[in-house]
Curated annotation (Swiss-Prot):
GO terms for molecular function: dioxygenase activity; metal ion binding. It is an enzyme of class 1 (oxidoreductase). It comes from Arabidopsis thaliana. This is 1-aminocyclopropane-1-carboxylate oxidase homolog 11. 2-oxoglutarate binds at R303.
């Protein structure tokens, strides 16, 4: 009986938080000094919740010479290959996205979340961003089996293949989102070429599989947390995408799990973070690795990040994906069963960010 009571209380508290439509920022605006218990992460995850003491750093790759000549491009492909096979993450500098575009999207995200009229934000509030061109929420997995909520608010929008009209986006971040998404799609085109070449295949092969077809932007706003040791910004997870391009500000807190240790992804001015998603690991048959990562809560803030997910759409999409035929053989048979983006993503979102791997459910 007591267990049911605890579970019922947790639902009631989450529902009450949901009903405010004010998110985590609403708690900060109310000047709380202790975070609600629904944000307390399980105690068994706390011992390793600390900043990295490792000297390890994820690879940084300079794209400046990617189209200069063949030797320069081949050298970059080798660096990309090493990064995605061994780390699953890398940072890119000289990626072609203008610095002013990077700054404006961060400013736009901040403007929306710090909108003075709360009714403007509330009008966009929805936990189901698959049915809305633009949605604002706090913890999409609010009612999932995830053991706790985490310290962030988010806005999300599908920018391709069916982008919103300008009128469907809030005025505070409209121009910034449209402009930034154009540059990210262009960078994604280049990244999938380099990844194809890193597989030893023709540069167009991943694009021909529609890896670049869908772009979902999720922009996170992490308010300062009065008790950062009790919660997380985002709990441990891997991405349900082919590829993710992340812009982060200078506050930090992103960590990746590498060789059983948490490694900080230190902010690099003007850089973008690129990471392999579950679907790219699946179709490359474990050639490229999708790595678990998380974001720590912080007394500093707000922290702002913009994550752009390629082909994480769960809208109607019947394409069946499995390990690429070019990468399997008798000696290296398929390690995953076939699935669709829709099937995979529906299970991923239903499960929530509970710290367990969804990809393992598809392993043969």
């Amino acid at each position: 009986m007591a267990k049911n009571s605890v579970e019922f209380d947790r639902y009631i508290e989450r529902k009450a938080f949901d009903n405010t439509k004010e998110g985590v920022k609403g708690l900060i605006d109310a000047k709380i000094t202790e975070i609600p218990r629904i944000f307390h992460v399980p105690q068994d995850t706390l011992p390793d919740k600390k900043r990295s003491v490792s000297d390890l750093e994820i690879p940084t790759i300079d794209f400046a010479s990617v189209n200069v000549d063949t030797p320069s491009r081949e050298a970059i492909v080798e660096k990309v290959k090493y990064a995605v096979e061994n780390w699953g993450f890398f940072q890119v500098i000289n990626h072609g996205v203008p610095l002013n575009v990077l700054e404006e999207i961060k400013d736009g995200v901040r403007r929306f979340h710090e909108e003075e009229d709360p009714e403007v934000k509330k009008s966009y509030y929805s936990l189901d961003f698959t049915k809305n061109k633009f949605a604002y929420s706090s913890n999409f997995d609010l009612y999932s089996s995830s053991p706790s909520l985490t310290w962030r608010d988010s806005i999300s929008c599908y920018m391709a293949p069916d982008p919103p009209t300008p009128e469907e986006l809030p005025e505070t971040c409209r121009d910034a989102m449209i402009e930034y998404s154009k540059h990210v799609l262009s960078l994604g085109d280049l990244l999938f070429e380099l990844l194809s070449e890193a597989l030893g295949l023709k540069s167009e092969i991943l694009k021909s599989m529609d890896c670049l077809k869908s772009l979902l932007m999720i922009c996170h706003y992490y308010p300062p947390c009065p008790q950062p040791d009790l919660t997380l910004g985002i709990s441990k997870h891997s991405d349900n995408s082919f590829l993710t391009v992340l812009l982060q500000d200078n506050i930090g807190g992103l960590q990746i799990l590498h060789q059983d240790s948490w490694v900080d992804v230190s902010p690099l001015p003007g850089a973008l973070v690129v990471n392999v998603g579950d679907f790219l690991q699946l179709i490359t048959n474990d050639k490229f690795i999708s790595v678990e990562h998380r974001v720590l809560a912080n007394t500093r803030g707000p922290r702002i990040s913009v994550a752009s997910f390629f082909s994480s759409s769960i809208r109607e999409n019947s394409t069946v994906y499995g390990p690429m035929k070019e990468l399997v053989s008798e000696e290296n048979p398929p390690k995953y069963r076939d699935t669709t983006l829709r099937e995979y993503s529906e299970g991923y979102f239903k499960k929530g960010l509970d710290g367990t791997s969804h990809l393992s459910n598809f392993r043969i």
